[in-house]
Curated annotation (Swiss-Prot):
Gene3D superfamilies: Lactate dehydrogenase/glycoside hydrolase, family 4, C-terminal, NAD(P)-binding Rossmann-like Domain. GO terms for molecular function: maltose-6'-phosphate glucosidase activity; metal ion binding; oxidoreductase activity, acting on the CH-OH group of donors, NAD or NADP as acceptor. CDD domains: GH4_GlvA_pagL_like (cd05298). It comes from Lacticaseibacillus paracasei (strain ATCC 334 / BCRC 17002 / CCUG 31169 / CIP 107868 / KCTC 3260 / NRRL B-441) (Lactobacillus paracasei). GO terms for biological process: carbohydrate metabolic process. The lineage of its organism: Bacteria, Bacillati, Bacillota, Bacilli, Lactobacillales. The active site is at 173 (proton donor), 267 (proton acceptor). Keywords: Carbohydrate metabolism, Glycosidase, Hydrolase, Manganese, Metal-binding, NAD. It comes from the Bacteria. This is 6-phospho-alpha-glucosidase 2. NAD(+) binds at residues 7-73. It catalyses: alpha-maltose 6'-phosphate + H2O = D-glucose 6-phosphate + D-glucose.
Amino acid sequence: MNQNKQFSIVIAGGGSTYTAGIVMMLLENAERFPLRALKLYDIDEERQATIAEAIAIELKEKAPAIDFTWTTDPQTAFTDVDFCFAHIRSGGYKMREQDEKIPLKHHVVGQETCGPGGIAYGMRSIGDIIELIDFIEKYSPDCWMLNYSNPASIVAEACRRLRPDAKILNICDMPVGTQRRMSQIIGLQPKDLEVRYFGMNHFGWWTSVKDKAGNEYLPQIRDYVAHHGYLTQIEVDTQHMDASWQATHKKAQDLLAVDPHYLPNTYLKYYLYPDYVVAHSDPDYTRANEVEDGREKCVFSAAQKIIDAGTSDVGSFPIDSHASFIVDLACAIAFNTHERMLLIVENNGAVANIDDNIMVEVPCIVGKDGAEPLTQGKIPMFQRGMILNQAMVEKLVVDAWINHDYQELWQALTLSKTLPSAQVAKEVLDDLIEANREYWPELKHDEHEVHLISESAVSEI
């Protein structure tokens, strides 16, 4: 792609609460990533229309030359596009609430991307992401799909196996947000940092944080996190500021205590301290409810205000600067900039002592041909054991989706560190199946019915 090219993009998940902020961010970056066309695509026509009508007013005022459309038709959406930015939520907030509340009913971690909730979400998401890939390959085969839909690791593993030749890069905003906090702790800008990191999505550790001159800041940040977690004096992003997120950032000090050598991803709390998480969760009011009562209402009321007024003078959407990593990634591909970014890629030796076919999150150099992971060497036994366990959970989930196999999904839940036993795993699974009948493939049981030892039977032995 030449330096003077203008790009056509489609945002899959056009009705998302993040869409408007991302569009504003694209306008902010128009000099380095100019747009000729912007499309929104969603299967929820009514939800998307509210966001799209408000964006149309913003674009008419700020960038009238951009050809803007929104649609529920795949051919219209995916024809003549250079990039697809994908942030879909399969099942919407209605099912996110079930992902969180069903496990909590069983006194198990209820979270949208980790544990049984993440597995349920993954089972809904695989087919939808594969469908997007197929639309792209049919209507715009040269298009790159930049996917930041959750649960990213399960989705990435499914894409590796089901669409191995797809032009897709999987990226997550969580490390970006944490690195913003790190930069604030040491008084630098996020772009000043050059990090080393290994793990899986929502499941990893920073082993080095340097500036461009090669000065190492890991010890300084580590000392800060040991006392304060990742809480900072000044909030550095808008995505992770709610009360539940503040508690998560604070909990990082306890994650660091488990291994004080490396800086942990905050999501590790769900695996290392699941009992704490459950004890501090409200089974009747979860993160899904917090988002619906906060961000959801705020974004849609702002959109309706713009629509009713017919102008953004009443209050423009804020720029989601936190999402600038998406433009960084698109520019790296479009202009072969060899940007260094954390991406979810097939291991292939990047982490020396885990399997090559595990989808890892590591620093990569990104250019026109995609991502080249940087080698991280061998990792310690503790982290290796954690990663291998979680990788097998996610592989079993994908197996279960492909094979429509109840047994494999039960095994995946049983293997997860967030569940205490096979019995609890089965009870949670059966409730999740009931809630997800509209979304999951129908799972086949083994011909032999499963009988578990009941509490009463144990007491009689």
